[in-house]
Curated annotation (Swiss-Prot):
The gene is SLC25A1. Residues 1-22 are annotated as: Disordered. The keyword ATP-binding does not apply. It is a multi-pass membrane protein. Keywords: Antiport, Membrane, Mitochondrion, Mitochondrion inner membrane, Phosphoprotein, Repeat, Transmembrane, Transmembrane helix, Transport. InterPro entries: Mit_carrier, Mitochondrial_sb/sol_carrier, Mt_carrier_dom_sf, TXTP-like. Residues 1-15 have a biased composition (Low complexity). Mitochondrial electroneutral antiporter that exports citrate from the mitochondria into the cytosol in exchange for malate. Also able to mediate the exchange of citrate for isocitrate, phosphoenolpyruvate, cis-aconitate and to a lesser extent trans-aconitate, maleate and succinate. In the cytoplasm, citrate plays important roles in fatty acid and sterol synthesis, regulation of glycolysis, protein acetylation, and other physiopathological processes. One of its GO terms (molecular function) is citrate secondary active transmembrane transporter activity. It comes from Bos taurus (Bovine). This is Tricarboxylate transport protein, mitochondrial.
Amino acid sequence: MAAARAPRALTSASPGSGKAKLTHPGKAILAGGLAGGIEICITFPTEYVKTQLQLDERSHPPRYRGIGDCVRQTVRSHGLLGLYRGLSSLLYGSIPKAAVRFGTFEFLSNHMRDAQGRLDSTRGLLCGLGAGVPEAVVVVCPMETIKVKFIHDQTSASPKYRGFFHGVREIVREQGLKGTYQGLTATVLKQGSNQGIRFFVMTSLRNWYRGDNPNKPMNPLITGVFGAIAGAASVFGNTPLDVIKTRMQGLEAHKYRNTLDCGLQILRNEGLKAFYKGTVPRLGRVCLDVAIVFIIYDEVVKLLNKVWKAD
């Protein structure tokens, strides 16, 4: 592609030039997958606690008194590794999830930049929404459904799943493929809004930081701070959808006719506060999650730019 036609990519710059270099979607897929795998290994304990608190419904006597009590009970019963129960199900999904997200975002954003290669905030929002939907349908919904069922099963009195793959086989055998796509509508809404908010905030902050110099290098620390801010914004923006999604994918999903019915039942039986159950552990996890992912993604793309010459 001629230099005059190359749009500016979100993560790479061409020093000394008025326009930034295109980030090839293939690079985005590789960098995104690596970033997703590393991130989930670091942040999984907070995801585990968040899921436990959301499944601890108020309609029954609460099992946990809060975040600290959930951690204490888990460590006392299963040791420190107990906080990593269900990791495999999320790890298998995190790598392709981030790969699809960043690959799609770069593909869309490379076609939506202006003549100077800039991506404005509105287009960043649209590209984020566009990246979140296929991420939800292809990877997130089936993997999150399996993860929630697996964690729920492992914390029951008599666990029936011997491992991740055994759990997948049992879920498919008992419920068919439909059993791995529970809560699809809530998941699409959640992921679409998630990525829309995050990329909107990241694009806005990057544009503000770089000002009139689109090639101004981004320090990893600055990228991490911007990522944490983007993560916090997405948490407060769509935690209710995350709660509904988790309920729709749990072992008691049969109680709800659909996504709307789930939301109405939660509101009627538990009140508005229930929609923000698990917000604190999710906030800590997501801020760290988004910061780590964007840092690793940016650095891997920089490395790939040195060894993979693609127009």
